[in-house]
Amino acid sequence: MLNIGFGNYISPQRLLAIVSPDSAPIKRLILEAREHHHLIDATHGRRTRAVLVLDGEIIVLSALHPETLVARLSPPP
């Protein structure tokens, strides 16, 4: 399981991409996911720093930086 912050976890097998929320296409993706009830906000009211795209059109918002999440995904040396 991948810790995405604040005691929230996702299955790494379902993860397709970890992206920054700053670009216009990602903002549109978040808006569409919210409209279709496919959005999970795991930021606990903090700023969104990473957008996780899961299979099944699920979008997850995280307050952790994408680099932090990738480091947690990578196996320890």
Swiss-Prot record:
InterPro entries: RemA-like (IPR007169). Belongs to the RemA family. This is Putative regulatory protein tsl2331. It comes from Thermosynechococcus vestitus (strain NIES-2133 / IAM M-273 / BP-1).
